């Protein structure tokens, strides 16, 4: 994992490890709403891998799982606050 140096403060940020590698999760289920909702912000957008720390493989899986859960109406496309 590459260390990132911030230009503004010259601090070194160590990236987060991939949650799915640490917990040794092999299958991500779209029906697991608690896990899926961790990767969505309060506006309903999918969080990037820079924020979540996921590797590219698991980030792709998470985005597909979120899209599948939205279609099955398990999670909303947008939040209630934005709809009004």
From Swiss-Prot:
UniProt record, GO biological process: translation
InterPro entries recorded: Ribosomal_bS18 (IPR001648), Ribosomal_bS18_sf (IPR036870)
Keyword Ribonucleoprotein: yes
One of the record's GO cellular component terms: cytosolic small ribosomal subunit
Superkingdom of origin organism: Bacteria
A molecular-function term among this protein's GO annotations: structural constituent of ribosome
Swiss-Prot/TrEMBL keywords: Ribonucleoprotein, Ribosomal protein, RNA-binding, rRNA-binding
Family, per entry: Belongs to the bacterial ribosomal protein bS18 family.
Purpose: Binds as a heterodimer with protein bS6 to the central domain of the 16S rRNA, where it helps stabilize the platform of the 30S subunit.
Annotated NCBIfam families: S18 (TIGR00165)
Subunit description: Part of the 30S ribosomal subunit. Forms a tight heterodimer with protein bS6.
Protein name as annotated: Small ribosomal subunit protein bS18
Protein's organism: Mycoplasma mobile (strain ATCC 43663 / 163K / NCTC 11711) (Mesomycoplasma mobile)
Taxonomic lineage: Bacteria, Bacillati, Mycoplasmatota, Mycoplasmoidales, Metamycoplasmataceae
């Amino acid at each position: 994992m590459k260390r990132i140096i911030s230009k503004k403060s010259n601090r070194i940020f160590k990236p987060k490890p991939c949650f799915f590698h640490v917990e040794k999760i092999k299958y991500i289920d779209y029906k697991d709403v608690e896990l899926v909702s961790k990767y969505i912000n309060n506006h309903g957008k999918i969080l990037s891998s820079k924020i979540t720390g996921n590797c590219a493989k698991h980030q792709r899986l998470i985005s597909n799982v979120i899209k599948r859960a939205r279609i099955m109406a398990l999670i909303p496309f947008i939040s209630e606050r934005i709809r009004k």
